[in-house]
Amino acid sequence: MSLLTEVETPIRSEWGCRCNDSSDPFVVAASIIGILHLILWILDRLFFKCIYRSFEHGLKRGPSTEGVPESMREEYRQEQQSAVDADDSHFVSIEL
């Protein structure tokens, strides 16, 4: 037997809830959270590519260098380049 048939029963010509505690604050909060979750899930599925494409490009840019002195930036670039150049016979790709 499904949960739907156990919770809701046909009353005259409409569907109604058998539970008397539908005004309970926890029931109302759970209903609101459930509806919001459903809406967010649908939006996530509809706009999946738009949402996650920005994350993908943002992460591939590398760490932020805002506020870092130029000498430290150059040192970081040299470390990354030396890691790539460690083995000249094979191409090494490092993504942060």
Curated annotation (Swiss-Prot):
Transmembrane segments: 23-43
A single Gene Ontology CC term: host cell plasma membrane
Lineage top rank: taxon: Viruses
Region (Disordered): 59-88
Keywords linked to the UniProt accession: Disulfide bond, Glycoprotein, Host cell membrane, Host membrane, Host-virus interaction, Hydrogen ion transport, Inhibition of host autophagy by virus, Ion channel, Ion transport, Lipoprotein, Membrane, Palmitate, Phosphoprotein, Signal-anchor, Transmembrane, Transmembrane helix, Transport, Viral ion channel, Virion
Regulation: The M2 protein from most influenza A strains is inhibited by amantadine and rimantadine, resulting in viral uncoating incapacity. Emergence of amantadine-resistant variants is usually rapid.
Record's bilayer topology term: Single-pass type III membrane protein
Swiss-Prot/TrEMBL site (Seems to be involved in pH gating) positions: 41
Residue ranges, Virion surface side: 1-22
GO process annotations (BP): protein complex oligomerization; symbiont genome entry into host cell via pore formation in plasma membrane; symbiont-mediated suppression of host autophagy
InterPro entries from the UniProt entry: Flu_M2
Sugar-bearing residue positions: 20
Compartments, as annotated in UniProt: Virion membrane; Host apical cell membrane
Site (Essential for channel activity, possibly by being protonated during channel activation, and by forming the channel gate and the selective filter): 37
Covalently lipidated residues, kind S-palmitoyl cysteine: 50
GO MF annotation list: monoatomic ion channel activity; proton transmembrane transporter activity
Residues exposed to the Intravirion side: 44-96
Residue list for modification Phosphoserine: 64, 82, 93
Biological function: Forms a proton-selective ion channel that is necessary for the efficient release of the viral genome during virus entry. After attaching to the cell surface, the virion enters the cell by endocytosis. Acidification of the endosome triggers M2 ion channel activity.
Free-text domain note: Cytoplasmic tail plays an important role in virion assembly and morphogenesis.
Family stated for the protein in its record: Belongs to the influenza viruses matrix protein M2 family.
Other observations noted: When the channel is activated, one or more imidazole moieties of His-37 probably become bi-protonated.
Subunit description: Homotetramer; composed of two disulfide-linked dimers held together by non-covalent interactions. May interact with matrix protein 1.
Protein name (record): Matrix protein 2
Organism of derivation: Influenza A virus (strain A/Swine/Colorado/1/1977 H3N2)
Chain's gene name: M
